Structure formats: C-alpha cells, structure tokens
Swiss-Prot record:
Gene name, Swiss-Prot/TrEMBL: rpmE
Organism of provenance: Rhodopseudomonas palustris (strain TIE-1)
Designated name of the protein: Large ribosomal subunit protein bL31
GO terms assigned for molecular function: rRNA binding; structural constituent of ribosome
Signal peptide: none
GO cellular component assignments: ribonucleoprotein complex; ribosome
InterPro entries from the UniProt entry: Ribosomal_bL28/bL31-like_sf, Ribosomal_bL31, Ribosomal_bL31_A, Ribosomal_bL31_sf
C-alpha cells in the first residue's frame, strides 16, 4: 500500500436517534468524534413499516412544493 495517499481511518462514536451509541471505524471526522444520526434503521420507515416523513432541513422541501405546486394541475 502506498503511504500518504489513503485517508485517516480511526474510531468514531455513532449516536442513534434513540440515544444509543456504538463505536466503529471510519474516515469521517477525527478520532473520537461523535456522528449524530437524523434517521437510522430503528426510525426509518423502510425498516419499521411506518409511513414516510420528510425532514425539511433549511426549508428546501417547502420551497420546492411552493414553486411547483400547480405544475401538473389541469384547469
């Protein structure tokens, strides 16, 4: 393996939506950082069988819906 061409691979802590934590190795962040998940297998509708909810971060979904609200409506 060539030296100095691969990203740093270190241990981080992943925090699930219910607060449980586990450690894994990753190239994300720095050694000891915490990665807080917004959605995970315990809360995602694909794995829980629930209805889908859209997380609107920064109003992007609402801006899209406002912009294209009448796009396919027939008069």
């Amino acid at each position: 393996m060539k030296t100095e061409i691969h990203p740093d691979y270190h241990t981080i802590t992943v925090v699930m939506t219910d607060g449980t934590e586990y450690q894994t190795r990753s190239t994300w962040g720095k050694e000891g950082d915490k990665l807080n998940l917004d959605i995970d297998p315990k809360s995602h509708p694909a794995w829980t069988g629930g209805t889908q909810q859209v997380l609107d971060r920064g109003g992007r979904v609402s801006r899209f819906q406002k912009k294209f609200s009448g796009f396919l409506k027939k008069d």
